[in-house]
Amino acid sequence: MGREFSLENTRNIGIMAHIDAGKTTATERILYYTGRIHKIGETHEGASQMDWMEQEQERGITITSAATTAQWKGHRVNIIDTPGHVDFTVEVERSLRVLDGAVAVLDAQSGVEPQTETVWRQATTYGVPRIVFVNKMDKIGADFLYSVGTIHDRLQANAHPIQLPIGAEDEFNGIIDLVEECAYMYGNDLGTDIQRVEIPEEHKELAEEYRGKLIEAVAELDEEMMMKYLEGEEITVEELKAGIRKATTSVEFFPVICGSAFKNKGVQILLDAVIDYLPSPLDVPAIKGIVPDTDEEVERKSSDEEPFSALAFKIMTDPYVGKLTFFRVYSGVLNSGSYVKNSTKGKRERVGRILQMHANSREEISTVYAGDIAAAVGLKDTTTGDTLCDEKSLVILESMEFPEPVISVAIEPKSKADQDKMGTALAKLSEEDPTFRAHTDQETGQTIIAGMGELHLDIIVDRMRREFKVEANVGAPQVAYRETFRSAAKVEGKFARQSGGRGQFGHVWIEFEPNEEGKGFEFENKIVGGVVPREYIPAVGAGLEDALKNGVLAGYPVVDIKAALVDGSYHDVDSSEMAFKIAASMALKAAVSKCNPVILEPMMKVEVVIPEEYMGDIMGDVTSRRGRVEGMEARGNAQVVRAMVPLSEMFGYATSLRSNTQGRGTFSMVFDHYEEVPKSVSEEIIKKNKGE
């Protein structure tokens, strides 16, 4: 059996948004209208089709991005529902990596919220074309044009409405299509009574004004259209659509549409927009990769004729079939039962079965083609970000980069039986989620788990209990501090031991200097004339890397420094790799007195939404937590305070905000950057870590 849908008629899209903007409901409705679901599940009743892990149904938020296939007007649409909660940014990163386009869902009352900014930035990094869907037009305080304004102000994005709502809040009962110059009126909230009519008289003037603005914005990006526009010629619907499509797929323009997924309004037009304006796998640039042995760069085009290549973007453990590996096929064809090469790990893998996923049911298929998204059963060594490819034509596609965890807690099993199971559970969970780490603290022997935030770790512990039946006690959260150097110095490290028999000798001079923020550790060899033999130089680098894991001030990892090996000496008989490793770590310890080491802490971008009367208390509270208020604005009848606050001061903030605002305030936070800790705090951290 050949391909069911051509590449032009395939769309791989993600649905991304801030928590509670309604994107799971939007996805549900898409599945409903494309004939994949027979009854609609409401998120707030805990029965949504996409949210299928137990915790998601309880909490009403989406944690794992489920990949689902739907069909609309002769097109196949593969949808990945991504979580909007900041602790799960890794899920969003992974999804964006394998998508061709995305729908950003906004809440019509709030517009762009902090998590929207984060996800938008991630999508820009990966060059993903987007449509913006302003959802919840039926909500009190819904304001379409305000929401569009926030896209310009907060995201600096070239976004323009291609629709306008008719009415808002309870009165929201239609949508004007500016491209086709018509309107859709809704007779009820079930989406069963929709009529295409002329634009109502009272809305004509506004519609004309916004259609003019739309044509102008698109013409600016299209020379031919610009000429016609300037000469006053009529621009046809087809030309306008083609112009919008071209500008959207080249990520220069973002069409904005509106609706209410919950009330079944605007969903079909959203699907039309996905097909009209988002790219097919043929519209996006060919993916680049490198050939493992030669490091030469190669391209893989989206075509069934090319050699097979795919990227594994998600691992899940399924109670019935075991380990599922979700992958996106970039080129070629794969049959179930065949062998592929995991070129990242250099391992051969057998693809047992291939499943096409619907939110929580699955359909077995025998072949996947270029542009498809599917899940494989039977892969043993493959983890997130690995490349799978044809054994005869190896390639490694660019992998994904994941942020380092910012928060950790100690965890201990409640009983001996739990202890054995806990190791397995943690290994499986960290395989699924690259931003979750588990390790044993060498000094205390405790098991430490680290992740992107309190909710992230809560859910991990919860999953251990439910899926792996492990009961565990969790300690207080710890912040992932870092250390770095503020000044440069040249220091010596000398290790010489002579105690009968063969001695040990290693001697180095290393120049340390601060590196740019986020650049990590860089080691350079500047030895001339062989004063340290070449075979010992990697040992110096390795010795420094080991020593950097436990910093010099308070034992935190040292980041963002450069080290250059400039001089040293060796002994013909007594020198060894080990001796040079130790000498390098001695040099790092000696650098403490000279390089002005400091402690860095994670700073969180915090947004607090509160009724006006609590403004004073909240501002005072933020300042008392060493926070810097960076801006305030009114949103509807509430006030929004934006601030930068150290993570260490944010523990338990949810409880304190609840009591300060009688439960009427909400907040969200996202990791922003590392910053130097004030001296007084730094002294406390050092004291605490040295057990004084």
From Swiss-Prot:
InterPro entries with a match to the protein in the record: EFG_II, EFG_III, EFG_III/V, EFG_IV, EFG_V, EFG_V-like, EFTu-like_2, G_TR_CS
Entry keywords, A to Z: Cytoplasm, Elongation factor, GTP-binding, Nucleotide-binding, Protein biosynthesis
GO molecular function: GTP binding; GTPase activity; translation elongation factor activity
Principal localisation: cytoplasm
Gene3D superfamilies the record matches: 3.30.230.10, 3.30.70.240, Elongation Factor G (Translational Gtpase), domain 3 (3.30.70.870), P-loop containing nucleotide triphosphate hydrolases (3.40.50.300), Translation factors (2.40.30.10)
Localization, UniProt: Cytoplasm
Sequence positions that bind GTP: 17-24, 81-85, 135-138
PROSITE patterns from the UniProt entry: G_TR_1, G_TR_2
Domain tr-type G: 8-282
GO cellular component: cytoplasm
Family designation: Belongs to the TRAFAC class translation factor GTPase superfamily. Classic translation factor GTPase family. EF-G/EF-2 subfamily.
Free-text function comment from the UniProt entry: Catalyzes the GTP-dependent ribosomal translocation step during translation elongation. During this step, the ribosome changes from the pre-translocational (PRE) to the post-translocational (POST) state as the newly formed A-site-bound peptidyl-tRNA and P-site-bound deacylated tRNA move to the P and E sites, respectively. Catalyzes the coordinated movement of the two tRNA molecules, the mRNA and conformational changes in the ribosome.
PANTHER family, per the entry: RIBOSOME-RELEASING FACTOR 2, MITOCHONDRIAL, TRANSLATION ELONGATION FACTOR G-RELATED
Protein name: Elongation factor G
UniProt source species: Bacillus cereus (strain ATCC 10987 / NRS 248)
